Regions:
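Hydrophobic helix-and-loop "lid/oligomerization" segment in the mid-to-C-terminal part
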Residues: 1, 16-19, 99-201
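N-terminal small/polar loop signature for handling phosphorylated ligands or for N-terminal nucleophile
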Residues: 1-40
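A glycine- and small-aliphatic-rich helix-loop capping segment at beta-alpha/alpha-beta transitions
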Residues: 3-6, 36-44, 64, 79, ...
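Short, well-ordered alpha-helix to beta-strand connector turns
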Residues: 4, 17, 41-42, 56-59, ...
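Hydrophobic/aromatic beta-strand patches that form the interior of the parallel beta-sheet core
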Residues: 8, 21, 43-47, 59-62, ...
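Solvent-exposed alpha-helices and their adjacent loops that cap or buttress functional pockets
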Residues: 12-15, 36-39, 53-54, 82-84, ...
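Short glycine-rich anion-binding loops that position phosphate/pyrophosphate groups of nucleotides
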Residues: 13, 25-28, 50-52, 165-166, ...
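Short alpha-helices
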Residues: 47-113
């Protein structure tokens, strides 16, 4: 996505910002290294869709019925003024949080907003292929291990798998490479609940 290379990870700097906008973050402690900057900011805004969000910012825009934070953002914008690059980013956010429009959080409004973004001539097929479906060889290997070592419980209605740190070290992957494993487990016929646990430092 355009602008991705300009993103910076907070490095503990003491800089104070006039405004801090937290997006898709349900709780203050989920901001990680950015939390000190949030607490020092002159004004704070939170845009989110998690029902667990209690509203930790000075101004909060939270819609627990929305499919994603990007859907909430779309409702705040004049869609006619949204650029193609911005539309691409918003579409990707909605697509990922809805599991490419298959999760129960997907509503008719979600689809209407996605359609409006598509009308901006965004490369929606490429976005989904490159950011949702395509995986590296190592990511496929570690998914294979998780599926191979999974087990079914409760008469096959629940499937569980575990990934240990030593396994991730063996494959040379991090927790970010584990995306999609629990979704793949959930697709098993007869399964109603999928649980994927992984060890962290």
């Amino acid at each position: 996505l355009k602008g991705f290379s300009e993103l910076r990870v907070p490095d503990g700097e003491e800089r104070e910002y006039d405004l801090f906008i937290a997006v898709d973050c349900a709780a203050l402690d989920r901001l990680g290294k950015a939390q000190p900057a949030f607490e020092k900011a002159g004004k704070t805004l939170c845009i989110d869709h998690h029902v667990s969000n209690k509203g930790y910012a000075l101004t909060n825009i939270i819609d627990g019925d929305a499919s994603s934070a990007c859907e909430v953002i779309c409702r705040l914008l004049d869609m006619e003024k949204v650029s193609r690059d911005a539309a691409s980013a918003l579409y990707m956010g909605i697509a990922h949080d809805t599991g490419v429009f298959q999760y129960s959080c997907t509503s008719p409004e979600t689809m209407r907003l996605a359609a409006a973004l598509m009308e901006k001539q965004i490369p929606y097929t490429e976005i989904l292929e490159e950011t949702f479906y395509k995986k590296t060889y190592l990511q496929n290997q570690v998914m294979g291990k998780a599926l191979l070592e999974s087990m079914r419980l409760l008469n096959g209605k629940c499937v569980v798998s575990v990934m240990r740190q030593k396994d991730m070290d063996f494959f040379g992957v991090t927790t970010t490479d584990l995306d999609g494993i629990v979704s793949q487990m959930r697709l098993t016929r007869g399964v109603e609940v999928a649980i994927f646990l992984y060890e962290t430092n």
